[in-house]
């Protein structure tokens, strides 16, 4: 925030007249997100420390038009054998001890393939992650995409014999899209910052199926 101090002072002064609200600083992109009255935008653009102004662009997840058909349980799923993930397991590279953040629609943290290796957020984050969209601890996945991706990454195969690529990895859930797959740039950046601030090793942002 040191590099943003002059702009922040300018914005905070305008909160008293209700021309500015909901100020949020980002460090990973040196950006400030806020709501402003349209009449104030031109004046804001004249500030010497502001390089650019843009909308908090809405982002949408791309889903398959047709549901993916369930396939019979196999010993090893095709995606794993295609990239030889099972070969490296034999050398001990199973993701053990590695924390992976899945930034998506949330996760079913009670899923049998995931619940035994969830990130320990302590009392501050009791549900093993955070809901950026609603700014609370409810990371429940009402869409299914986030849980699907989490399983692809680190499902441990408890419910059958299909597993994720890194079945011993630790899962952190960062909910950045709502149940319809809608989000915005501010929430995506906030999600990445949350993961980095909590010492994540890898972050996966809403991968395509």
Please give the residue ranges for each predicted region.
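Solvent-exposed, acidic/flexible segments
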Residues: 1-4, 37, 78-81, 132, ...
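Extracytoplasmic/secreted envelope proteins and their assembly/folding machinery
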Residues: 4, 8, 38-41, 47, ...
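Autoinhibitory propeptides
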Residues: 8-90, 120
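Glycine-rich, acidic and aromatic/proline-enriched surface loops and short helix-turn segments
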Residues: 13, 155, 194
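Solvent-exposed loop/turn segments at secondary-structure junctions
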Residues: 29, 39-41, 59-61, 105-109, ...
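Subtilisin-like serine protease catalytic core
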Residues: 87-128, 134-185, 198-201
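Short acidic, glycine-rich surface-loop motifs adjacent to enzyme active sites
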Residues: 192-209
